[in-house]
Amino acid sequence: MIEKNYQPADIESRMSRVWEESGAFKAGRPERRDAAPFTIVIPPPNVTGSLHMGHALNNTLQDILCRFERMRGRDVLWQPGTDHAGIATQMVVERQLMERQEPSRREMGRAKFLERVWQWKAESGGTIINQLKRLGASCDWSRERFTMDEGLSRAVVKVFVELHREGLIYKDKRLVNWDPKLLTAISDLEVQQVEVKGHLWYLRYPIEGRAFSPDDPASFIVVATTRPETMLGDTAVAVHPDDERYSALVGSHVILPLVGRRIPIVADDYSDPEKGSGAVKVTPAHDFNDFEIGKRHGLPQISVLDQEGKLSLVGNEDYLRGLPEGALQFAEEFHGVERFAARKQIVARLEDFGFLEKIEPNTHMVPHGDRSGVVIEPFLTDQWYVDAKTLAQPAVAAVRAGETSFVPKNWEKTYFEWMENIQPWCISRQLWWGHQIPAWYGPDGKVFVAETEEEAVGNALGYYVEQEVITPEQGHDMAEDPAKREGFITRDEDVLDTWFSSALWPFSTLGWPDETPELQRYYPTDTLVTGFDIIFFWVARMMMMGLHFTKEVPFSTIYMHALVRDEKGAKMSKSKGNVIDPLHLVDEYGADALRFTLAAMAAQGRDIKLSTQRVDGYRSFATKLWNACRFAEMNGAALTAGFDPTSVKETLNRWIMHETTLAAREVTEAIEAYRFNDAAGAVYRFVWNVFCDWYVELTKPLLMGEDGPAKTETRAMIAWVRDEILKLLHPFMPFITEELWDVTAKRDGLLVLAPWPRKPRALTPEQIATLSLAGPTDALIPPVIGTFEDDTEEEFSDPEAEAEIGWVVDLVSAIRSVRAEMNIPPSTLTPLVLVDVSDETKARGQRWNDVAKRLARLADISFADAAPEGAVQLLVRGEVAALPLKGVIDLAAERARLEKEIAKADADIKRVDAKLSNEKFVANAPEEIVEEEKEKREAALERKAKILEALERLKKAS
């Protein structure tokens, strides 16, 4: 018995328990031993995370695919797990220690701190997993993995050691994104570009051999910079090769102000003649672009900042080399000054000596750490790197060969551009939480990389005995007693970038490096669903690692979904206060409503503009389905044993059979093509418009009539269509559909494991004989009902039934549309004249007379050779239907009203056009505001077109 009111919270809680207790989501079910596998690996959320709208979209789409393929009979593995999230987790635990006034990380030491992190993970690390379950994610939760669990850690170490042995992992001194607060290198993804209202300082660099005078432009070259504090590390001035202003100076030198360093003027394409003075200072140790210029011209790299962002000048040999004697005093004065304080002091000193030409306001993007909030420094430091260029080549070739494809396809271009210009990947982080790098150092700095400490120590001691640094006896003692080798062999303290372990996720979660049965069955995976923002950080690296270590692509399809924005199209951010919490929406509207909203709006390549009104609308859709199932139940709709939907006699029932087949095909093809919005739209239209609005409405005369066989057939057909709807809708709205499946009949299995609708066929006599002969309300619906032929069978189709019922639907719809356009009150009945129609249409008009009158608010239906005067004419399937409105409404007043509406629409269009033609508005307004104005224009044009159509009808009637 279906409850009167739809209560999502109660249903979701109950169905979650049912699924978990039944093991419905488990891969490797015995009955699917011979089924084709279908594998998706979840993009592992941070263990510190809480569900945000990006997670909700990403996991809804994955779940749609998994539930769809599971219902199609495949052995589905949706592999869940979480990422250890190095910086994020370490910060959470450090903050907790501070709040509890406990010893800091450094005070307690590495071992004890890591114990605390594992303790935190055990207590709080499951939050996001439970939230994903609330969303309805049908992962095989029994296989949950963590990027630092024992098996995955073994895979990480093996990969590092093998890549190092192959020369693909190495140590190098390069620029990295350095966080001066967290004191670690961070990835590009952890850098936020923030628009800052700053300044552009124009500095005078004296030309060597000329007497410097601020009043003599020939004695200096002007460079423009946003970072005057880094000028202390300048090693060149660059000008464009084609800039005639400076062509005579290329090859000469300038003297660096305040410092006295002699640096060359070089010609380089990076310099922009149109920007600033056209000459730029080159600081290879403090700017990524300058680093590349420095490599092209063989310039020294002089770092003038320390890890905390303070000037480091005293004792800095690179800085002091070649400077005049007086430079040491300056170095002592500025040494240890914080970078932004140093900026002010250096600018003041430059001004004092006449080296400051001018200062201009300058709004520009400045990199900030997304977790620390401080300005990030390009910092020259020794780090571990992966030779990404070598690993990228097979990954590019695989996509070009079609082994892996992107959906939408345009993302392939982005992938190729990045992969073909890929830089070395910095994989070391100055943290404690993470996979510690398996490298050990001897007393002379020689590196020993090995899978275990024992192996590294053995290799190191053997080497130093051979080099006669230690005696064989000392080597033996050190091997036996760790205390004796303390300080002689030390492990690298750094940990690996979190993305390093994530890059192995598709195969490490299945047991690699062991050849496990799971690895053989479920790898390569089928589809990766992910956001475009991690195409480089994760997707590309999984491709590289998967191909290198398994010789196979990790997935055949990569579906890139777009962003979820607010209803105006703005990116969600805490600072804007426009973040929508998916769990709040789940609490208020139910998980099914949120899931359906996200699917319905997930058009390929288009960002989602999410509004609570849309979610509320799909909550109403769920209620509509609930009430339709209650209607079916109250009218005795039930599947009887042996019912064959292809053998129904009633035209209406054959029509709904035809429409159900079309809907099933449309939904199936759309999901297969990753057109989630089209699939959701198709099932929505079928449920709301076809089933609820038309079929249910049109069955009422049959259900209330005296024709027993027709009534019995219709009840069974309603139940059959209801079940097909529950199947089609299940991937999108799993909770409500599973609940309705459970309460509408006695079943022998869950909907989540029921077969997906395909092409219905009649049951054989033998199959019918095996069915229960109990009454319709007590019948156990066996799995054979709703079983399907393979795709070679001809699809059910009934053009005659479609022509008959489709005519009724089109006629009533057209009349309702005109009544709405003309403001005809619902209480006013209008006559209908079918004009010069065929005998077939005349017969239809007579057969459906009562239904059409009731649904279209008609006084009567008549037939004539010509349309009466004052009638609005409608074209219904190529024939004319006329609505005489003379005397029903004031035609002149209605015409005036419509003309007024057109004028209003024109005014709206004119107002928007004025905005969009204003170059200042388009250039300065936020992108989402401009987009909103364009949408307003489209809506006004559409509204105007409809009013013009109505006005044209009215003119003809007049």
Stretches with model-predicted labels:
Residues 1-242, 283-296, 300-318, 343, ...:
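N-terminal, positively charged nucleic-acid-binding surface of large information/translation enzymes
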Residues 4, 81-84, 113-118, 142-153, ...:
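Conserved short loop/turn motifs at secondary-structure junctions
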Residues 123-133, 371, 620-633, 653-663, ...:
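Core structural elements
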Residues 370-372, 564-568, 572-650, 745-751, ...:
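Catalytic adenosine-cofactor/nucleotide-binding cores of aminoacyl-tRNA synthetases and other
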Residues 4-6, 14-16, 66, 134, ...:
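NTP-handling and nucleic-acid-processing catalytic cores
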Residues 83, 180, 186-192, 441, ...:
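Acidic, turn-prone loop/beta-hairpin segments
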Residues 194, 282-285, 377, 488-494, ...:
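Conserved phosphate-binding loops in nucleotide/dinucleotide-binding enzymes
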Residues 616, 745-958:
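C-terminal low-complexity, glycine/proline- and small-hydrophobic-enriched intrinsically disordered tails
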